[in-house]
Amino acid sequence: MKTLLLTLVVVTIVCLDLGYTLKCNKLVPLFYKTCPAGKNLCYKMYMVATPKVPVKRGCIDVCPKSSLLVKYVCCNTDRCN
């Protein structure tokens, strides 16, 4: 009985997400990083002249404003950038 109870406790701990962590793509989308606490957005930065070629990707706390030369796209789900 104790073994069954211990097994149920372990399974519960493994299955519960004890603290949600966002995952954002790095520059090469095959790789991603787990964002630290407080950084709850993924972002993609690219030059307006070349929108198909991202310059930077990662985690961020506040989405920066785009400019005439640089555009930022932010999102808040895993690997959305």
Swiss-Prot record:
<dbReference type="InterPro" id="IPR054131">
    <property type="entry name" value="Toxin_cobra-type"/>
</dbReference>
<dbReference type="InterPro" id="IPR018354">
    <property type="entry name" value="Snake_toxin_con_site"/>
</dbReference>
<keyword id="KW-1052">Target cell membrane</keyword>
<keyword id="KW-0800">Toxin</keyword>
<keyword id="KW-1053">Target membrane</keyword>
<keyword id="KW-0472">Membrane</keyword>
<dbReference type="GO" id="GO:0031640">
    <property type="term" value="P:killing of cells of another organism"/>
</dbReference>
<dbReference type="GO" id="GO:0044218">
    <property type="term" value="C:other organism cell membrane"/>
</dbReference>
<keyword id="KW-0204">Cytolysis</keyword>
<keyword id="KW-0964">Secreted</keyword>
<feature type="disulfide bond">
    <location>
        <begin position="75"/>
        <end position="80"/>
    </location>
</feature>
<keyword id="KW-1015">Disulfide bond</keyword>
<dbReference type="GO" id="GO:0090729">
    <property type="term" value="F:toxin activity"/>
</dbReference>
<keyword id="KW-0732">Signal</keyword>
<keyword id="KW-0582">Pharmaceutical</keyword>
<feature type="signal peptide">
    <location>
        <begin position="1"/>
        <end position="21"/>
    </location>
</feature>
<dbReference type="InterPro" id="IPR045860">
    <property type="entry name" value="Snake_toxin-like_sf"/>
</dbReference>
<dbReference type="GO" id="GO:0005576">
    <property type="term" value="C:extracellular region"/>
</dbReference>
<feature type="disulfide bond">
    <location>
        <begin position="24"/>
        <end position="42"/>
    </location>
</feature>
<dbReference type="InterPro" id="IPR003571">
    <property type="entry name" value="Snake_3FTx"/>
</dbReference>
<feature type="disulfide bond">
    <location>
        <begin position="35"/>
        <end position="59"/>
    </location>
</feature>
<protein>
    <recommendedName>
        <fullName>Cytotoxin 1</fullName>
    </recommendedName>
</protein>
<comment type="subunit">
    <text>Monomer in solution; homodimer and oligomer in the presence of negatively charged lipids forming a pore with a size ranging between 20 and 30 Angstroms.</text>
</comment>
<feature type="disulfide bond">
    <location>
        <begin position="63"/>
        <end position="74"/>
    </location>
</feature>
<comment type="function">
    <text>Shows cytolytic activity on many different cells by forming pores in lipid membranes. Exhibits concentration-dependent growth inhibitory effects in the lung cell lines A549 (IC(50)= 0.88) and NL20 (IC(50)= 1.91), in the prostate cell lines PC-3 (IC(50)= 3.13 ug/ml) and RWPE-1 (IC(50)=0.35 ug/ml), and in the breast cell lines MCF-7 (IC(50)= 9.10 ug/ml) and 184B5 (IC(50)=6.21 ug/ml), with high selectivity for the lung cancer cell line A549 (selectivity index=2.17).</text>
</comment>
<dbReference type="GO" id="GO:0016020">
    <property type="term" value="C:membrane"/>
</dbReference>
<comment type="similarity">
    <text>Belongs to the three-finger toxin family. Short-chain subfamily. Type IA cytotoxin sub-subfamily.</text>
</comment>
<dbReference type="Pfam" id="PF21947">
    <property type="entry name" value="Toxin_cobra-type"/>
</dbReference>
<dbReference type="InterPro" id="IPR003572">
    <property type="entry name" value="Cytotoxin_Cobra"/>
</dbReference>
